[in-house]
Amino acid sequence: MPKLILCRHGQSVWNAENLFTGWADVDLSEQGENEAITSGKKLKAQGIEIDIVYTSLLERAIKTTYHLLNESNQLFIPIIKSWRLNERHYGGLQGLNKDDARKKFGEDQVHIWRRSYDVAPPKQDEAQRESYLNDRKYEHLDRRVMPESESLKDTLVRVIPYWNDQISQQLLDGKTVLVSAHGNSLRALIKYLENVSDEDIVGYEIKTGAPLIYELTDDLQVIDKYYL
């Protein structure tokens, strides 16, 4: 029976500082490291054997993946990295303190950007965009698909084809798959898996650094889900 494990990265240093992060490539905080280590120990205690891992190109997700596999004695497992699992791109908000953003744009507007399904924040300015376009992580990426800002809906549009083409194929082969990613890229997957409404998915909370297990039928219908 296929098993899917979703894990949101542990707390990042920008999470701890209340900054919009998005595609900014920041490290885990000490708390985030400990969350990931604890989760890896839980995987080991439950005897969960992972066959393949999918993660993003961002350090906080990659390091979370490392701790999960290291603590469960599974560092040999293949890891596939893709930009399609990156966090939602927060555009011009990236790097801003959330309280400062509320003062600048108004609390209602910031709430709409954060918690609506199909409204994206302001785009990056040209200098910010160039810094991402020139990042080696994205040198293979067609500039025409490189986001300047994303809503949750936009994030889903890039995540679900990757699910259909790559991740789901491993599950259909009966594999146990770990997806170590971000709050919004995982929300996109959960919306698709559970057919969650546009209104409900924006308020869906996913614990940081905690494995969420999906037991699936052979045709990938959800039987059960639970946190370790």
Curated annotation (Swiss-Prot):
Write the record's keywords in alphabetical order, separated by commas: Gluconeogenesis, Glycolysis, Isomerase
**Source taxon at top rank:** Bacteria
Q: Which residues of the sequence carry a binding annotation for substrate?
A: 8-15, 21-22, 60, 87-90, 98, 114-115, 183-184
Site, as annotated: Transition state stabilizer: H182
GO terms, molecular function: phosphoglycerate mutase activity
Cross-referenced SMART domains: PGAM
Alphabetically, which GO biological process terms does the record hold? Answer: gluconeogenesis; glycolytic process
EC numbers listed for it are 5.4.2.11
**What general EC class does the enzyme of this chain belong to?**
isomerase
Reactions accelerated catalytically? (2R)-2-phosphoglycerate = (2R)-3-phosphoglycerate
Active-site residues?
H9, E87
Q: Which pathway is recorded for this entry?
A: Carbohydrate degradation; glycolysis; pyruvate from D-glyceraldehyde 3-phosphate: step 3/5
Alphabetized Pfam families for the sequence: His_Phos_1 (PF00300)
Function statement: Catalyzes the interconversion of 2-phosphoglycerate and 3-phosphoglycerate.
The UniProt entry, under HAMAP family, shows:
PGAM_GpmA (MF_01039)
Query: Family, per the entry?
Result: Belongs to the phosphoglycerate mutase family. BPG-dependent PGAM subfamily.
Could you tell me what this protein is called?
A: 2,3-bisphosphoglycerate-dependent phosphoglycerate mutase
Source species of the chain? Staphylococcus saprophyticus subsp. saprophyticus (strain ATCC 15305 / DSM 20229 / NCIMB 8711 / NCTC 7292 / S-41)
